[in-house]
Amino acid sequence: MNQFYALFLVACIAAMANAYEEPDLDALAEFCGKESNRKYCDQIAQLATQHAIGINQEQVRMEKRKPSFVRFGKRSGYPLVIDDEEMRMDKRKPSFVRFGRK
């Protein structure tokens, strides 16, 4: 039972440490095999599982899509200045502009 527990802890810690650097699994198994270090290994295993669960939840979330159309209302007749040339924007009917697929 102690060997299985140590292997489980090693696997959890290895999963957490993979993001940072290559762990020394033999030293970790030896450290967790001692009774005096059991509480530290429990804390490490708990942190590793919480970290793994957090990563899985982030990957599962899907990104929200942008709306496929934008509605433009009537524009006011304010002057638009581009390169020192004043252009007048006329009012027009509301329209839909699609982005992407037709």
From Swiss-Prot:
Predominant location: secreted
Taxonomic lineage from the root: Eukaryota, Metazoa, Ecdysozoa, Nematoda, Chromadorea
GO BP term, example: neuropeptide signaling pathway
Protein known as: FMRFamide-like neuropeptides 9
Prodomain positions: 20-63, 75-90
Annotated localization: Secreted
Keywords: Amidation, Cleavage on pair of basic residues, Neuropeptide, Repeat, Secreted, Signal
Function text: FMRFamides and FMRFamide-like peptides are neuropeptides. KPSFVRF-amide: Has no effect on somatic body wall muscle, inhibits contraction of vaginal vera muscle, and inhibits the activity of the dissected pharyngeal myogenic muscle system. Acts as a ligand for the npr-22 receptor in vitro.
Signal peptide positions on this chain: 1-19
Modification Phenylalanine amide occurs at: F72, F99
Keyword Signal: yes
Molecular function as annotated in GO: neuropeptide receptor binding
Tissue: Each flp gene is expressed in a distinct set of neurons.
GO CC entries: extracellular region
Family: Belongs to the FARP (FMRFamide related peptide) family.
Matches recorded under InterPro entries: FMRFamide-related_np (IPR051041)
